[in-house]
Amino acid sequence: MDRKVAVHEDGYPVVSWVPEEGEMMDQKGKDQVKDRGQWTNKMEFVLSVAGEIIGLGNVWRFPYLCYKNGGGAFFIPYFIFFFSCGIPVFFLEVALGQYSSQGSVTAWRKICPLLQGIGMASVVIESYLNIYYIIILAWALFYLFSSFTWELPWTTCTNSWNTEHCVDFLNHSSARGVSSSENFTSPVMEFWERRVLGITSGIHDLGSLRWELALCLLLAWIICYFCIWKGVKSTGKVVYFTATFPYLMLIILLIRGVTLPGAYQGIVFYLKPDLLRLKDPQVWMDAGTQIFFSFAICQGCLTALGSYNKYHNNCYRDSIALCFLNSATSFVAGFVVFSILGFMSQEQGIPISEVAESGPGLAFIAFPKAVTMMPLSQLWSCLFFIMLLFLGLDSQFVCMECLVTASMDMFPQQLRKSGRRDVLILAISVLCYLMGLLLVTEGGMYIFQLFDYYASSGICLLFLSLFEVICIGWVYGADRFYDNVEDMIGYRPWPLVKISWLFLTPGLCLATFFFSLSKYTPLKYNNVYMYPSWGYSIGWLLAFSSMACVPLFIIITFLKTQGSFKKRLRRLITPDPSLPQPGRRPPQDGSSAQNCSSSPAKQELIAWEKETHL
C-alpha cells in the first residue's frame, strides 16, 4: 500500500493515499457512485429558485403587512432590509452552494467545521416545512375539486354542514332580519371550519382523521415525488411550467380585479402612505421578517440549488434579479388582493379593514367569498385555487429536493448509487405524509398553526442569518469569499454586499431578533383560542430544535477534535483544502482539487487561505 505521509502544521500526521484495488472501495463500487449532476442551463436554476421563493407568502402575507403597517410608507423599512439583509444573505447562500458544489450541511462544514450546525439547523427547518407546508396544498386541492359544481358549496346555508347560525348576506332577503348583535356565521366560514377542517374545540381534542383531506394530501405528495424523482434533470424541466403558470393566473386575476367596482378604493387603501406608522418598531420588525420569509433565507434551499450551477455561472447577477423579481411579484399581488377586497367592501357595504385578512383566512375565506359575488364564479374559483396550488407546489418540491440533496451529500457512498435516490425520496415522502396525517385530523389546524408560528418563525431565521454572516464575514473572511466569487464570475461584487456581511446585516439581525423576543405574544387561533401551556411548550421546542443545532455542534466538534483549545479552534475554523482556490479551475472528473497543479502564486494563496479572520 503506497501512502504519502505529511505533517499538519499543528504536529498531527495527515495521511492521504489512493486506495488500491480491493481497498476501501473497488473500482466497480466507484463506478456505481453517480455524479451530483448540474442544471442543463441557467434558466432551470433561475426558475427553480423563483419557484421556491415566490410562493403563498407573496399573495397572502405581503399585501396584508403593507396595509397594516402604513401602506406605501411600509416600503421604506422594507427596502432598507431588502438591500442590507435580503440581497446580501440571498447572494451569500447561492454563492456558497455554487462555490462548494455541496448541499447546506456539507457546504458549511467545508467552509467552517466549527459552524456546521448552521447547515444542520437549516435541515431541521426544511424537515418541518416538508411536513406542514404541503397541508396548504391539500386544502387548495379540496377547494379546487369543490369548485367543479353547478353552485359553489360555500355560497348558501342550505348544506348539511350548515348550522342555524348561518346567514347568507348576499341573499338580502335572508339577511334582512338579522341584527348585528346576533351570533351569526357566514356560509364560507362554515364551509371552511365545518366542511373542510371539521375543527374541534382545541388542540386537546384532535378528533378523527378527515379522510378527504388525507387523500388530497396523498395526491399532493405523489405529484411532488414525480417532480423530483430524477433529480435536477426532472426538477429543471417541471419548473418551466410550475414557476411560470402562476404568473399567467396572477395577470388574469389582476385584470379581473382592477375592473371590478370598488377596486380603486381597495388599491388606495393598500398604498396610501401613513408616515407616522414608521415610529412603531413593529413596522420595522415586520419588514425584516417578511424579507427573510419571502427570500427562503436560512432554509438551505438556496445553497442546494446553487450547488448544481456551473462553477463560472454569474450567481451575483442571478441573485439580484431573483430578489427584485420576488419583491415585484409581492407588490403586484397586492393589487390583485386589494382590488378584490375593495370590491367585497363595496358589495357588502362594510369598511375594507373588516374584510382584509392574511394567511389561510385570506386564501380560504376572503377570496372564496369574493368569487361568489362575481359572474362565472366557478371559473374564477378554479383559476384562483390553481394559482394557489402551483405557487405552493414548486416551493414544496424544491424544498424536498434540497432536503434530499443535503442527505445525499452527507452520505454520498451510501446514497449516490443507482436506485438509492428514488428509495430515499420515497422514504422521506412516506414518512412526511404519515406525520402530516396528524395535521389533517379535526384538530390538526391547531397543530398547523404551531408549526407555522414557531417552527419556521422569524426568530429562527434571524438567529441563523446572524451566524451565517458572522461565519462568512468574520471567520472565513469577507475578502477571501470575495476572492472566491471573483474567481467564479470574473469580478468583485458591489462593496455594499461586503459591508452588509460585516456590519449591516449582523447589526439589523441582532436588533430585530431581540426586539422580536421582547415583543413576543403567544399564539392565538383566530385571535381567540388560547393554547394550553403544554401547547406553547411544543411550539418553543420546535423553534429551539433548529436554533440549538448551532451551539450543539460547536460543542460536539470541539469534543471530537484533539489538541489544545487554541489548536482545536484553529483547525475547526480552517476551510477544507479541497475547496476550489482562486485562479484554479475546479476538477470536472471528481478528483481532488489538491492534485491539480498550481503556480507559485497560487500555492502562496493556498498557504494564506489557512489563516482566518477570527
Curated annotation (Swiss-Prot):
Keyword Oxidoreductase among record annotations: no
Organ and tissue specificity: Predominantly expressed in the liver (sinusoidal hepatocyte plasma membranes), also present in the renal medulla, where it localizes to the basolateral membranes of collecting ducts (particularly at the papilla tip) and the thick ascending limbs of Henle (at protein level). Some expression is detected in the leptomeninges, but no expression is detected in brain parenchyma, brain blood vessels, ependymal cells, the renal cortex and the intestine.
Cytoplasmic side: 1-44, 557-614
GO MF entry, a single one: gamma-aminobutyric acid:sodium:chloride symporter activity
Keywords from the UniProt entry: Cell membrane, Disulfide bond, Glycoprotein, Membrane, Neurotransmitter transport, Symport, Transmembrane, Transmembrane helix, Transport
GO annotation, biological process: gamma-aminobutyric acid transport; glycine betaine transport; neurotransmitter transport
Chain positions carrying an annotated carbohydrate: 171, 183
Segments passing through the bilayer: 45-65, 73-92, 117-137, 211-229, 238-255, 291-308, 320-341, 374-393, 423-441, 458-478, 499-518, 538-556
UniProt-annotated location(s): Basolateral cell membrane; Cell membrane
Catalytic reaction equation(s): 4-aminobutanoate(out) + chloride(out) + 3 Na(+)(out) = 4-aminobutanoate(in) + chloride(in) + 3 Na(+)(in); glycine betaine(out) + 2 chloride(out) + 3 Na(+)(out) = glycine betaine(in) + 2 chloride(in) + 3 Na(+)(in)
Topology Extracellular: residue spans: 138-210
Region (Disordered): 574-602
Membrane topology (UniProt): Multi-pass membrane protein
Superkingdom classification of source: Eukaryota
Cysteines engaged in disulfide bonds, as pairs: 157-166
Polar residues bias: start-end ranges: 589-601
Function field: Transporter that mediates cellular uptake of betaine and GABA in a sodium- and chloride-dependent process. May have a role in regulation of GABAergic transmission in the brain through the reuptake of GABA into presynaptic terminals, as well as in osmotic regulation. Probably also involved in renal and hepatic osmotic regulation.
PANTHER family for this protein: SODIUM- AND CHLORIDE-DEPENDENT BETAINE TRANSPORTER, SODIUM/CHLORIDE DEPENDENT TRANSPORTER
Family of this protein: Belongs to the sodium:neurotransmitter symporter (SNF) (TC 2.A.22) family. SLC6A12 subfamily.
Name of the protein this chain belongs to: Sodium- and chloride-dependent betaine transporter
Upper lineage: Eukaryota, Metazoa, Chordata, Craniata, Vertebrata
